[in-house]
Design a protein with these regions (language model features):
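Active-site-proximal specificity loops/subdomain of glycosyltransferases
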Residues: 120-175
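Short beta-strand-to-loop acidic/aromatic patch adjacent to the donor-nucleotide binding site
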Residues: 172-184
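Short, acidic, metal-binding catalytic loop of nucleotide-sugar glycosyltransferases
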Residues: 101-113, 121-124, 139
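C-terminal catalytic/acceptor-binding lobe
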Residues: 64-65, 77-82, 97, 101, ...
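N-proximal low-complexity "stem/linker" segments adjacent to membrane-targeting elements
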Residues: 48-107
Length: 356
């Protein structure tokens, strides 16, 4: 087997283990074997494990077989090939593990056009800044689809705003699809394909994870009253980014990239700012795995479940403690902001979209 085969198997086993599969012991053994073969393909070395080098980009099935001979699923994959960009950001402390995330994105059924990594030299929030000479960064740049972008440090907004700024800078703007991902999550091979296929059916924001906002007295209710996401397009759905979200650039306006207000209202809650922008543009969202928001173990696996690693995140450091109060405060500020700016709140949009 090739290194890429072991990598794909490793990701599949990790997903099964995270989902609590009944054969957990055997799966854990298989994970160990895959990791050993990634490090030592011949299985002969007794040396301590070292980090595997990036796998080569998968060869598109369309280059090896005539379209007429492919299955329906394979024809769909060919048609979707290269139709979107993947966008993410990271901080200095996450770089040592990021190669695993990037490798999972290189093992997709449907390859993206490119994977944009937006990083910054200057510190902000948890990020101490990244040096261009960082050896982990140099390793990441060996991946064929990676494109490193040095940008101003706006925290979590870096995964979406630089891409939209570039898009809106064109004199003739075209519709572009892009997927935002997190820097600590391993994405299964069907990840991008499922997002794209769902988008083509429903023409809306598509997420694997999210919450459904609830109205009380014509206002957005307090966070504890919110439900799990709805698995159909709804204005009530608020996608949350960990397991990936697909957007079209036409879901946004140029106002979105003016970040002073966003950072003032929701400096670490980019999911809220994005929802308010898309919602007020009349764009619903669908959540494909509603229970993912109830536990990290119900969604895609992360690179490290240790308390030390998971604790070093914006959510844990800024949003987790008294998260309800912080979320509710951000919602109130956003509602007042958009009502003053546009004369309409998101609650009104949600209410109008509900069946009579």
């Amino acid at each position: 087997m090739r290194r890429g085969d072991f990598t794909a198997a490793l990701l599949a086993y990790e997903v099964l283990l995270a989902q609590g599969h009944s054969q957990a012991a055997q799966i854990a053994l298989n994970i160990g074997l895959c990791r050993k073969r990634l490090v030592d393909p011949e299985g002969l070395s007794s040396a301590p494990p070292v980090r595997p080098m990036p796998a080569a980009a998968p060869t598109s099935v369309s280059k090896s077989l005539p379209l007429s001979t492919l299955t329906a699923a394979a024809r769909s994959a060919v048609a979707l090939e290269g139709k979107l960009t993947v966008s993410l950001t990271t901080i200095d402390s996450r770089l040592p593990h990021l190669h695993r995330v990037i490798e999972s994105l290189h093992q997709q059924d449907v390859s993206p056009k490119e994977i944009r990594l937006h990083i910054s030299r200057e510190p902000y929030l948890l990020d101490k800044g990244i040096s261009p000479d960082d050896p982990h960064l140099k390793e990441l740049q060996q991946f064929p689809l990676i494109k490193v972008k040095w940008v101003d440090n706006t925290g979590p907004y870096r995964k979406i705003v630089p891409f939209l700024q570039e898009h809106f800078s064109h004199h003739v703007a075209t519709d572009e699809l892009f997927v935002t991902v997190d820097d600590d999550t391993l994405y299964p091979p069907e990840f991008l394909r499922v997002l794209l296929e769902t988008y083509e059916r429903h023409d809306c924001v598509v997420a694997f994870r999210g919450r459904a906002m609830v109205l009380e007295a014509a206002e957005i209710a307090s966070y504890p009253a919110w439900g799990i996401g709805l698995d159909y397009p709804s204005m009530s759905n608020l996608p949350t980014g960990k397991d990936g979200v697909l957007y079209s650039t036409r879901f946004f306006t140029r106002d979105f990239v003016r970040l002073d207000d966003a950072i003032a209202l929701a400096p670490t809650a980019d999911d809220l700012w994005i929802k308010w922008q898309c919602g007020l543009n009349g764009v619903p969202a669908i959540v494909l795995n509603p229970i993912a928001c109830t536990s990290d173990y119900k969604g895609f696996p992360v690179v490290d479940y240790s308390k030390e690693y998971r604790g070093n995140s914006l959510y844990s450091s800024y949003n987790a403690n008294s998260a309800q109060g912080k979320n509710d405060d951000s919602v109130r500020k956003l509602e007042a902001y958009v009502k003053g700016l546009l004369g309409q709140s998101l609650a009104q949009v949600i209410q109008m979209a509900q069946p009579a």
